[in-house]
């Protein structure tokens, strides 16, 4: 089986486990990008935590779910945004959030993976890769 977008597969695994009411989700294969996104979700209180499991091949993440995620996914096509665009929150980005103050956009920036709120504080832009609310 060829996995073209491991981040999309990880977000789908989390969303499906949340919809089924499960307490944990297994994400495989692992990557640094997925680890950084999970770190953000943990810091913002959407997941209870995660751990890396070395299976001798690609590795896996076990994610503890709290039942706080209503929707999660990737943004396709990956959209580059400047700081000014992010401050205005254009329509093509607003559609991924429930409302202005609810949810997060996750960006890949030159300074690392971060939320849109953190990018606004640092006054930098990046590529929008995922959303959660």
From Swiss-Prot:
Q: Which GO terms describe its cellular component?
A: ribonucleoprotein complex; ribosome
Which GO biological process entries does UniProt record here?
translation
Per the entry, what this protein does is:
One of the primary rRNA binding proteins, it binds directly to 16S rRNA central domain where it helps coordinate assembly of the platform of the 30S subunit.
Query: Which family does the record assign?
Result: Belongs to the universal ribosomal protein uS8 family.
Q: How the protein assembles, per its UniProt entry?
A: Part of the 30S ribosomal subunit.
Q: Which UniProt keywords apply?
A: Ribonucleoprotein, Ribosomal protein, RNA-binding, rRNA-binding
Could you name the domain of life of the organism this protein comes from? Archaea
Name a GO molecular-function annotation.
Answer: structural constituent of ribosome
User: What's the name of the protein?
Assistant: Small ribosomal subunit protein uS8
Q: Which Pfam families match?
A: Ribosomal_S8
């Amino acid at each position: 089986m060829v996995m073209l977008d491991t981040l999309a597969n990880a977000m789908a695994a989390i969303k499906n486990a949340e919809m089924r009411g499960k307490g944990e989700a297994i994400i495989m294969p692992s990557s640094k990008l997925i680890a950084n996104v999970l770190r953000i979700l943990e810091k913002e209180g959407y997941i209870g935590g995660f751990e890396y499991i070395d299976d001798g091949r690609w590795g896996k993440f076990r994610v503890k779910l709290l039942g706080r995620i209503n929707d999660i996914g990737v943004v396709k096509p990956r959209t580059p945004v400047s700081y000014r665009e992010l401050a205005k929150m254009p329509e093509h980005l607003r559609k991924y959030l429930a409302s202005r103050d609810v949810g997060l956009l996750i960006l890949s920036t030159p300074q690392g993976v971060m939320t849109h709120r953190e990018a606004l504080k640092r006054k930098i832009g990046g590529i929008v890769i995922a959303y959660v609310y």
